């Protein structure tokens, strides 16, 4: 039995297979996920698990060089955006429209669906390298 890090086998598997510039998304419970994209559904009940708990856990295991965040997240969920920025370290933030973010989900290795119910609690993480 794995004793540290992410215990969810689907998330752990996706992260371990990611290469430089591959993408992984984390979203709120309302984010529409394309049929062709792997869905890892963690949503249990309202706000469990939270977007931030999920992001923090993934960031512990995935080297991230850039993220895509919807403009609406910064504008309409500013408190959440402040928390996101704290977790990102030196990762570059690229702002795009919410529609563009939804369109980019089809290029992600997977989308992790959380129980989050904060509007625009969505992010695309682009993998970096550890060397």
Curated annotation (Swiss-Prot):
Top EC group: isomerase
Pfam entry (one): RbsD_FucU
UniProt binding sites for substrate: 28, 98, 120-122
Any single GO CC term annotated in Swiss-Prot or TrEMBL for this entry: cytosol
Sorted UniProt keywords: Carbohydrate metabolism, Cytoplasm, Isomerase
InterPro entries documented for this protein: D-ribose_pyranase (IPR023064), RbsD-like_sf (IPR023750), RbsD_FucU (IPR007721)
Keyword Isomerase applies: yes
Domain of life: Bacteria
Active site: 20
Gene Ontology biological process terms from the UniProt entry: D-ribose catabolic process
EC number: 5.4.99.62
Catalytic activity annotation: beta-D-ribopyranose = beta-D-ribofuranose
Primary role: Catalyzes the interconversion of beta-pyran and beta-furan forms of D-ribose.
PANTHER family registered for this protein in UniProt: D-RIBOSE PYRANASE
Protein family according to the UniProt entry: Belongs to the RbsD / FucU family. RbsD subfamily.
Record protein name field: D-ribose pyranase
Organism field: Clostridium tetani (strain Massachusetts / E88)
The encoding gene: rbsD
